[in-house]
């Protein structure tokens, strides 16, 4: 008894040693484990085996079909990490699997390799995995022949360079058996796993009338094309596709490799590997291959017919895909059982031809045509229409400025500069139209030129026009300053010249052109877009251009701030200008981060166009809308002087003569000056006259000097001194002299400062009005 006890203990000890052997699984996949197809199921079996056997280590490698070099690295890495059960799941890597299996044949490393037959010379640690895919494709072809409404079915296969054509022939024979007059469409995609090509190939078959499509791909791309076209799909990847697509999949075959993994992992753990083993499975074994439930869209009578065919296929003597006499055209001999010789059948590279009833159309190798992807029509048409409307508005505004150039609100804002500003707006809108079109070598340069020049004209003229107002009103000593339009044009041209110079550098050094880029902007590898590109020197010049426009914006902001104190409405455009500049700056703070962050080309173009149109249109409405509104509501006011703000008016009312005015014929500063220069005045010789007003206050002298286009000078001196002679307004008008507003008698010294302020306001009002139109300069040194 003791001897038996010792023997039992020893056996238990060795049993524990055997069970404690490690099993590290490595799975090499041809595609993605997320394809919901063959690769997914191979990896799912690894996960389930790891969980069931409580393994400490397992690993997988994906997308190895793309590069044999990467596949070889995966083999080496798996061996380096100590994997001792390596699964090679694809026919593509059979050669590499057998190579490394031969190199490690003397080690405790075991292999499961998918293939058709055992290697020669044979390797004891290799299990050959295969399943009867021919009967499955035959069954799905039979189902398709029963379900088709058009009488046309299709098949997508890797092709003769990758796989046997017997899968294609099996599907065709199944469909022909169900419907003898079937039309069969066949196409090759040169890969087990290329979703883009497979999807496009299936779409091509659908366009040619196929309403059911079989495949020998590792993913559901073909069936997705079917369902996207409103047709019913069939599951040919081994995944229970009804879990994902529901009733849109008519029927699927299911493969479950967990039993395979667990079986051979236990052999590794128990150290009892079955040498020279093979794992061939089919419907009859019911261990790894099953048929899924039918969709509710499949009629019951068709379900019954398919079930009957399944039962016949489970009889191993029923092999219609190898025994049909129609197969004789392949040139493969039949064996004694009336079947095509298996090895030659599996290696067949020839597609069956049609007969007098059925028809076979071979599309051969399929390649996706390279497709040009343009901007969406919504962007192209939307930007073009909106920009066109904005250009029309600009032209209308330009017409109004020209027609009503002598109106008070237009004349005070310098019509010439207003026209240049509107011209800049038109150019900006034209640039937006070019931005919305597909780039070409010409438009890549033209749109940048137009956009830059447009903003330079727009902001540059605003800057210069308001710089003059700042210089004239920022004049505490009331010195004589003559700044006509012709003195400002060189500044505008200087700003424009700087812009043109930078653009010329960008154009000359940047090598600006349009490139066709495949796979750009989240496109597939079979789609391309035209993209504007430049060299590094061009990028530097473009950044310099952005800095230049940024400086123009800053200067415009500064000048707008400086003229905000001007209390004469017609001259003080600081509010609309500042608002316009702020809007542009705000958009830049939005545009720049969006442009730097990853964005599609369409999104970038949309952002640029929308911001350019919105900022320019709002700025234009702010600058011109108020002017035209005043013209419409208050009249053209061509013969009226300039209205001041509330603050200015209140000062004028305090300093003017009221009920206590001893001289009813005196003219008051602060009141509207209704006079205007006429063409007759411009041709009269200058004269100087003294006009005496009786006033008890101290004497004052104001001298107005007119700078006409003829460069002649006329002076009007008004000498306020003690005199009993009064001159009325009518007498002044008869002499065709501009009426001069005075503050009359000052009742006390406390009002002197207010009088001087109003004198200055009126003098400056008249001066800026005339000088902006190149007509008059005012010398007020003696006020």
Curated annotation (Swiss-Prot):
GO MF terms held by the record: G protein-coupled receptor activity
Protein's cellular compartments: Cell membrane; Membrane; Endoplasmic reticulum membrane; Golgi apparatus membrane
Sequence ranges of Acidic residues compositional bias: 670-679
Keyword Cell cycle: no
Coiled coil: 56-85
Keyword check for Signal: yes
Gene Ontology CC terms, in alphabetical order: endoplasmic reticulum membrane; Golgi membrane; nuclear envelope; organelle membrane; plasma membrane
Residues of the signal peptide: 1-20
Role this protein plays: May act during the development and be a negative regulator.
Name of the protein in question: Metabotropic glutamate receptor-like protein J
Gene behind the chain: grlJ
